[in-house]
Amino acid sequence: MSAAPDFSKRYRVDNGRKFRLKDFDPRDSSGLKSKKHAEKELPRGIERLSELQDKLYAQDRWAILLIFQAMDAAGKDGAIKHVMSGVNPQGCQVYSFKQPSPEELNHDFLWRTSKCVPEHGRIGIFNRSYYEEVLVVRVHKELLERERTPPSLVTKNIWNERFADINAYEHYLFRNGVVIRKFFLNLSKEEQKKRFLSRLEEPAKNWKFSASDVAERERWHEYMVAYEEMIQRTATPHAPWYVVPADKKWYTRLMVADAIISALEDLNLHYPAVSAAKRKELKAARVALEHEGHH
């Protein structure tokens, strides 16, 4: 993206030890004042993303897993929709993880997402993910009971254990050719209120609103503490977090696109080389096609 080469780097966290959420401003747009500028840049970014995805698919070696986590109304759906709009649907899969089903609750906490990890050559997108297990389940500890974990295993160390499990799992995926990029869309409490009110005022947005949204808002501080520790404990060089400002949707989308492009460019993707035997075969096929009907 010409005006923003690796612009998203300032929001990248690949070592969480010193991470503090208060150091990241949800309103930031790093000097980009105009939505117009972003609207010109985003299509260029999407075009570049589409070229890279085509090579990823053809090369069939790496997979990309993009994970989106955020508070309600932060713009996860919109970011996914706008940024991935130019990507070939054959090479991209989106999974939204809602409340777990009884079947999912009867399995280990990574089971439902493991089935959806993208195969080589594909981009997989998780709209929410296994990170819910250290977010909503941590804020609402009664949810642990529904997970049917033996009580003797639910100790005060459970969150540390889950962070360790997630880190080991992401390391395992990386060693198997899955490149992970994780996005926390960092929305301010004031902006969430505005977006909730607009959902209530606009009939076309009413369906997005749920009474539980307001109840969850009352636990905002608890969620911020959970998000901060999640990033501190699971940001690694092979699976970094991007703490993307989310108060300006146009800026969020630009930064998400930039981070995905930079992850793909790091892979030095190219179309598979054609062997001499294959070239010979192609030449013969061309000759046959050109001589069709000349008998």
Map each language-model feature to its residues.
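Flexible, compositionally biased loop and terminal segments
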Residues: 1-295
